[in-house]
């Protein structure tokens, strides 16, 4: 009888401890959450102390992807699934290696202190696809600020936007060329400087100020010789890609990188390397990125993703996230388009 009581007491103690650890609340930017992630047996990724964010409100500035209602997505543009395309999907695929002549694919940009991820993810993938689908004839970088400021149906500029309408705008209105503020080439360069996003590096800290959305200029910088209207690059079609791993892979293999959004949780703010999956913390908002490929490491399938927080962040500007189970809704809202 005593043995039974002791066993039950031990079990209760174990369960209480287990529940306590599972439900423990960590400060998002603390040493405690970093230790918890790095010591977690099933994490699969490494966390590192960050000096980028001063608060969660500061972090939320970067989360500029707004969800498009499913009914509106279906109404505004078609959804492709590629079920009619029978092809062997490789275990690893990297658009940078598949199309090495398209320089934009390997370019990591910086959205700075503006919730313009939705615009960056879009113009980055559009630039890639323009080059790929033109056979290298349109090897350009398209302007994030042209889309950010002139697409009224996309959202609120630096305060966030919707992915789908950005691609529709590319088809209807076109987007001009650009580069970073530092390089200052093309028709309409990005006006905000590169800065360090929760890491230490060669750029100045991003600071606590969110930039106001610039006005829509519809003119090129003075030294650029091509008129604004003649510098426009347009797509022929925009469409949703079905929430399906193989459909997304086929789309990337055939036409190039895609734009997607995912839910950012508190633990992601501390990401340094590895294959991310949500371990702890609450949702902060949506973030738009560019999926350029996939792979498998230690039997874990992943998406290879280009971020817009410059090359000092994460894995040289990239990160990986678990593939095939809609981790953090990464496969739920994938957008793409074609130029021909």
Swiss-Prot record:
Pfam families reported in the protein's UniProt record: Peptidase_C1, Propeptide_C1
Tissue specificity annotation: Intestine (gut).
Propeptide stretch(es), residue numbers: 18-88
Class of this enzyme: hydrolase
An example Gene Ontology biological process: proteolysis
Active site (UniProt): 117, 287, 307
PROSITE patterns per the UniProt record, alphabetical: THIOL_PROTEASE_ASN, THIOL_PROTEASE_CYS, THIOL_PROTEASE_HIS
Protein name: Cathepsin B-like cysteine proteinase
InterPro entries, A to Z: Papain-like_cys_pep_sf, Pept_asp_AS, Pept_cys_AS, Pept_his_AS, Peptidase_C1A, Peptidase_C1A_C, Propeptide_C1A
Signal peptide (UniProt feature, chain positions): 1-17
Keywords attached to this entry: Disulfide bond, Hydrolase, Protease, Signal, Thiol protease, Zymogen
EC id: 3.4.22.-
Function comment: Thiol protease. Has a role as a digestive enzyme.
GO MF annotation list: cysteine-type endopeptidase activity
Cysteine-cysteine disulfides: 102-131, 114-158, 150-216, 151-154, 187-220, 195-206
SMART domains in UniProt: Pept_C1
Family to which this protein belongs: Belongs to the peptidase C1 family.
The keyword Repressor is assigned to this record: no
């Amino acid at each position: 009888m005593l043995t039974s009581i002791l066993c039950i007491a031990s079990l209760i103690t174990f369960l209480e401890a287990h529940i306590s650890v599972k439900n423990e609340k960590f400060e998002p930017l603390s040493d405690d959450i970093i230790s918890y992630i790095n010591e977690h047996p099933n994490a699969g990724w490494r966390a590192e102390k960050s000096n980028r964010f001063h608060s969660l409100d500061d972090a939320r500035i970067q989360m500029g992807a707004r969800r498009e209602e499913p009914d509106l997505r279906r109404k505004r543009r078609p959804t492709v699934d590629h079920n009619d395309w029978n092809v062997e999907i490789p275990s690893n695929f990297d658009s940078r290696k598949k199309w090495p002549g398209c320089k934009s694919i390997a370019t990591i940009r910086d959205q700075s202190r503006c919730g313009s991820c939705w615009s960056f993810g879009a113009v980055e993938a559009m630039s890639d696809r323009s080059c790929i689908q033109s056979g290298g004839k349109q090897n350009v970088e398209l302007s994030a600020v042209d889309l950010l400021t002139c697409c009224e149906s996309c959202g609120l500029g630096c305060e966030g936007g919707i992915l789908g309408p950005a691609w529709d705008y590319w088809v209807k209105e076109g987007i001009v060329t650009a580069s970073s503020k530092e390089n200052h080439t093309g028709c309409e360069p990005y006006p905000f400087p590169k800065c360090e996003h929760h890491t230490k590096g060669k750029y100045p800290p991003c600071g606590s100020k969110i930039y106001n959305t610039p006005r829509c200029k519809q003119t090129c910088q003075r030294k650029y010789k091509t008129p604004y209207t003649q510098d426009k690059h347009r797509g022929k079609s925009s469409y949703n890609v079905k929430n399906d791993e193989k459909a997304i892979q086929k789309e990337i293999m055939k036409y190039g990188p895609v734009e997607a959004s995912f839910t950012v949780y508190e633990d992601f703010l501390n990401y340094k390397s590895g294959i991310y999956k949500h371990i702890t913390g609450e949702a902060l908002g949506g973030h738009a990125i560019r999926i350029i490929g996939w792979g498998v490491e230690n039997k874990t399938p992943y998406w290879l993703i280009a971020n817009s927080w410059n090359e000092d962040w994460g894995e040289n500007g990239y990160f990986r996230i678990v593939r095939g189970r809609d981790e953090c809704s990464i496969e739920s809202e994938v957008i793409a388009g074609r130029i021909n």
